[in-house]
Amino acid sequence: MKNLINQRLFWLIVAFACYSINLPAQLSDIKTENGLVSGYKSGEISIFKGIPFAAPPVGDLRWKAPQPLKNWTGVLKCDKFSASPMQRKPVPFMMWTEEFITPPEKLSEDCLYLNIWTPAKSAKDKLPVFVWIYGGGFSSGSAACAVYDGEEMSKKGIIFVSINYRVGVLGFMAHPELSRESGARVSGNYGLLDQVAALDWIKKNIEAFGGDPQKVTIAGQSAGSMSVCALVASPLAKGLFRGAIAQSGGILSSFMKSNLTEAEKSGLTFMEKLKSANITELRQKSAEELIAAGGNFGPVYDGYVIPVDVFAAFKNGQFNDVTMMAGWVDGDGSLMGEQKMTPEKYKQQAIDKYGDKAEEYLKLFPGNTNEQVTASLLELNLMQFAALPAHLWAGFSKNTAYIYQFSHVPVDKPGFPNYGAFHTSEVPFALHTLHLWKRPWREIDFAVEKTMNDFWVNFVKTGNPNGNDLQEWAKYDKSTGRIMEIGDHPKLSPGLHKGEFDFLEGTINNK
């Protein structure tokens, strides 16, 4: 009997030990401005998920700038992601929707939280900080998507932070009533104000996690990239970061063009659609009702968060001139969809738009056949959405600039056609998260991932992507147009797209 009891006790101890191994190891509590937080350990990395950085934007705080947090007592357990911002469930229209856009967590208006991965051993380590801003067309997205996991990147000696921000109607609707009740007399851009609030929280608190508040680099992709550019343009973000990485998206183009007056009109139309008499009634609607009503909302050139004339602001040096890295994916143009147009109509549009410059335009973007027209329109989309804004920003900057083009073609996803180097495909390569993306990866994919992530980490640490025996990446200047082409074998490509850049920039300057 005694032996039987001892055997059972032995196996209970073994079972408990195995169970304990699978539990996240606990950390010492971290003191933030608002109270203590606890996280967990994964190997040498300390992880904190779901740290609040602003008061929940619910009730009367809906459609208001983020408000300060209230202090809490005790220890706030931060070991799982918060709810994702309210949004429509994305239709899986492309091969990456599930991985990049569809939030894995529940949805809630109470979504202003951030996540931290840190390898620091103490608050004195003063490590550089990388802040990730997700994309999703300003209508969807979440910091909880697995492809934005920061553990691998933090193993290289940096602190990785991912942040949530409001999207869609709850993040960007402007309205005359909202403008009147705002101290700044503007409305909309709440999602961008969330980002500023998160950066302000990071500046005040990241030292407790072993970070250096003077060494913050912001980065984002698509709408996240446009957010990065908006923060560079915003006087509200001055001093909150020292470097910026913009992946596939900018605001120095015609893609974003809504001013406050136009945005307020859209808000009035939306209110009428929901048969609400005023903002008070609209605030009483459920978030689900608001989202079901549709609408297209995004950042606004309001003169407060973003300058009314961004191009003029950059041209006159009125922006946060930080060290920058910007680029695009070879297939970014397909984001706007394939446009059908006859060669005759295409050429006439070129004449109508460019006049005596039409001949030069048609040499750069030919349209003699249907196939040429389609290819040229895709190229023009790429230029306007991502490539030209990066080129212009680098030209206006007095700081160091690095430009890239991602052309590596990832392995196919079963059941989908091959999209080539498609919009968003570079993200897991840059963030070192291929292992979280379900594909039959090849050695070349992992080699490109290592190279690209090393470039990114080096830039976060020093403001320079070079080092680690990598292909030398020269600083960008408009005269030579040297661009790092990140393909199977990264190489510096002088003059890539230089003709297109020169022509399109000339048309802007002549307006």
Show the residue positions of the predicted features.
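Substrate-gating cap/lid region and adjacent catalytic-acid/histidine neighborhood
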Residues: 252, 277, 281-444, 462
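Acidic/polar residues in short coil/turn loops that connect beta-strands
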Residues: 34, 194, 212, 301-302, ...
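Extracytoplasmic/secreted proteins, especially bacterial periplasmic and envelope-associated proteins
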Residues: 194-197, 201, 227, 262-269, ...
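Surface-exposed patches in mature extracellular/periplasmic domains of secreted proteins
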Residues: 214-217, 276-285, 403-405, 467-474
